[in-house]
Amino acid sequence: MRQLPPFSSKVFLAPMAGVSDPALRLLCKELGAGLVVTEFTNIHAIVAKEAQLHNISEFIEFSPRERPLSVQLFGSDLEALERAVKIVSPHFDLIDYNMGCPAPHVTEQMACSALLQHPDLTRHIFRTMVNATDKPVTVKIRAGISTPDRFLEIARIAEEEGISMITFHPRTVKQGYSGKSDWSLIKELKENVSIPVVGNGDIETPEDALRMLNETGCDYVMIGRAAMKNPSIFKQIKQYLETGKYDQVSDGERMEAFFRYLEYTKLYPTIRFVNIKMQAMNFTRGMKGGKGVREKLRTVKDEGELREVLMVLRTENNL
């Protein structure tokens, strides 16, 4: 196991396809996230782009201000995986491997959570990655396919092959994101490995984060969906863990955070407007008048129209 970089807090931002773009990652980092992770990236795409790019940051955009920064990969072809790891290794602080995504369009490619059923291949994947880099290699897993019967075996293989940290989302692939995540499985995992464990799933408040840490013994927690509407949750959790209390976040502060995000998107040409619009819809969830605003946001065609809609909400709510 390689030494992990120091983290400024115990709270990490989850990699989320179409969501955790570099602008949101930078915002969350500034608001207290101890680690941010890129959206998952296909190893074949990295290899294919290598000859066209002067630097991998032209394909996977990021800012030095995000550090420590983890890049998440998926794909099971060992030759492509080795090459992809070598390409990204000089540019990132950690390399994460996705064995958690339940989406059929990736599991059908023998990738992500489909690999939970293939421990031998998984061992070769971990070994290939660790041997291809001097950076810490980490993995994100689920509990199993239809029952929680795979995570301990995969975790033991990970530890044996030199994986430095495991992030665990204790739902099955069949569950997707429905039902409740079973935190008792995080506790079971932590009791069976000696490497750091990151708990993930159903953390909506600072109280939830502390409860997960206390109930499971996990070393860190990872926030996904809750950060989509309130990126200040990282600051709140950090405050709560350090002092036992935290500041409430007003709708005005959430709106300010979105406009900060909007400014950051200008630094990254690969962020599409459709994603910016989706982020605006996420940020307005729970706000007074937010439902009507989201209906209007669905039809906006550019940043100017988006700003007009949000400025009306700010004026009406005195934000």
Specify the residue positions occupied by each region the protein language model found.
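Glycine-rich, positively charged N-terminal anion/phosphate-binding segment
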Residues: 1-7, 16-87
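Alpha/beta catalytic cores of nucleotide-metabolism and tRNA/nucleoside-modifying enzymes
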Residues: 1, 7, 22-23, 127, ...
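Conserved, mostly hydrophobic/aromatic
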Residues: 13, 28, 39, 71, ...
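Alpha/beta enzyme core
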Residues: 82-95, 99-109, 120-195
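Active-site beta-loop-alpha junctions enriched in small/polar residues
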Residues: 16-18, 41-43, 74-76, 100-102, ...
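Short glycine-enriched, charge-decorated loop/helix-capping segments at active-site entrances
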Residues: 110-116
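Hydrophobic faces of well-ordered beta-strands that scaffold small-molecule active sites
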Residues: 11-15, 36-38, 69-73, 95, ...
